[in-house]
Amino acid sequence: MTTNYIFVTGGVVSSLGKGIAAASLAAILEARGLKVTIMKLDPYINVDPGTMSPTQHGEVFVTDDGAETDLDLGHYERFIRTRMSRRNNFTTGRIYSEVLRKERRGDYLGATIQVIPHITNAIKERIIEGGEGHDVVLVEIGGTVGDIESLPFLEAIRQMAVDVGREHTMYMHLTLVPYMAAAGEVKTKPTQHSVKELLSIGIQPDVLICRSDRAVPANERAKIALFCNVPEKAVISLKDVDSIYKIPGMLKSQGLDDYICKRFSLNAPEANLQEWEQVIYQEANPGGEVNIGMVGKYVELPDAYKSVIEALKHGGLKNRVTVNIKLIDSQDVETRGVELLKDLDAILIPGGFGYRGVEGKLMTAQYARENNIPYLGICLGMQVALMEFARNVAHMEGANSTEFVPDCKYPVVALITEWRDEEGNVEQRSEQSDLGGTMRLGSQQCQLTDGSLVRQLYGSDTIVERHRHRYEVNNMLLKQIEAAGLRVAGRSGDDQLVEIVEIPNHPWFVACQFHPEFTSTPRDGHPLFSGFVKAASEYQKRLAK
């Protein structure tokens, strides 16, 4: 199989939507029966985004194999069926650390290590490895052309045309075409300068995606084609839309997929976008709306919860309702009280790390439990639900997590290496033990309890979901909590860890240790989010009676 490469770069400004554009194009090519994958190359020096601030970088998207990656990989998985892995995302820091490790081992036989060829070769090797077994690989280069950090990646993708052949490589450049209200026209000069910058690096773009708040007129596209040395049919207008799921159809309507298939000599049938048309129809024709509050600590940057927000929208699609998401800072709940939670049809507490805002989340979980409001807790959202239930229902005063209070009387949540035996003694587990010593990452099997709500929602005894956490339910204190009315609805495949809890006498109260948002897609949804949004609709109807 010959693999073809489409390299996606951005110019003029950041946040043009390279990831969405790449994912949308991949969706069309996949709909033509081609085997497609997408890679994201990030120019920052962090080895991975795992320890980066969510309010700076956005969410960390976790893959099946446990890689902590850029949030764009979430977009990729929501648009195409191919599952991402650690091969689909790497950073400057990762490349440099690998090259330096090889140098220390003597792999380079005393050679002087340089950006060219050693760093660029390492980048190219990663790209080729990530694309194995696919007809088309889209490679998104993070940042903006002209950034000093991006230069090694841009040089590497320039060399790819030499290594694999120009007939198997394409360069797609996203650029801004701003509308000037005073002049009453769009301006192409920023695009011309951006392409000039790219040409100075040695890359001639084959396709230009022109981002604007309105359609770029044909005469302006012709002008761009002339000055940028690109065929007119390869100058694509991509205006702002109210739904990102309209973008595959917009690209297809301008013949971009035909142009690419012809360029790569790919004999593929016409794309069938019926599934995407169905998604767009569902989104545009809701039968109602629900208000769901998400109480977190990173709400100043919604991208910190990107997959959760999208999963809630997918749940709305499956129930034919619009989901209005109210982002609430958990610290505001601490200072201003649960009045902030009024007029909500459901409440969700997502994952997070650290003590800041935890008391507000505990107040939120208590409010949802006592007022029979549908509740979905994810990761830390499950842990605070457990802590709140232990304190206020199981009479375990001061119940807490060892993440926040290491020497608390009732450590109902503890580090994976910290477990209490039957006598109450702390049992230490090292990295050599079965459960490992740090973060639990990636897909893990979960056995669902017969008769539980989640068993009904999933329609299966066994599920696989993705994890990202260091703390787990302390089994030694579980019996007392269960006796007070909490039900364990799911356990790990080895029956050692609690994965899901429910409150049976509550209309809809589910909390899970894993992250179901990472596997939700607009076409398929996710059982937990579909059930959660349905419960919100039913709660709203009960109140209206």
Swiss-Prot record:
Q: Which GO terms describe its molecular function?
A: ATP binding; CTP synthase activity; glutaminase activity; identical protein binding; metal ion binding
Which residues are recorded as binding ATP?
A: 15-20, 72, 239-241
Q: Does the keyword Magnesium apply?
A: yes
Which residues of this UniProt protein bind UTP? 14, 187-192, 223
Q: Name the residues that bind CTP.
A: 14, 147-149, 187-192, 223
Question: Which CDD domains does this UniProt record tie to the protein?
Answer: CTPS_N, GATase1_CTP_Synthase
Q: Which GO terms describe its cellular component?
A: cytosol
Return the Gene3D superfamilies for the record. 3.40.50.880, P-loop containing nucleotide triphosphate hydrolases
List the catalytic residues.
379, 515, 517
Q: Pathway, according to UniProt?
A: Pyrimidine metabolism; CTP biosynthesis via de novo pathway; CTP from UDP: step 2/2
Residue positions binding Mg(2+): 72, 140
Which positions bind L-glutamine? 352, 380-383, 403, 470
Protein family per UniProt: Belongs to the CTP synthase family.
The task this protein performs is described as: Catalyzes the ATP-dependent amination of UTP to CTP with either L-glutamine or ammonia as the source of nitrogen. Regulates intracellular CTP levels through interactions with the four ribonucleotide triphosphates.
Misc remark for this entry?
A: CTPSs have evolved a hybrid strategy for distinguishing between UTP and CTP. The overlapping regions of the product feedback inhibitory and substrate sites recognize a common feature in both compounds, the triphosphate moiety. To differentiate isosteric substrate and product pyrimidine rings, an additional pocket far from the expected kinase/ligase catalytic site, specifically recognizes the cytosine and ribose portions of the product inhibitor.
The protein's name in its UniProt record: CTP synthase
Which organism is this entry from? Erwinia tasmaniensis (strain DSM 17950 / CFBP 7177 / CIP 109463 / NCPPB 4357 / Et1/99)
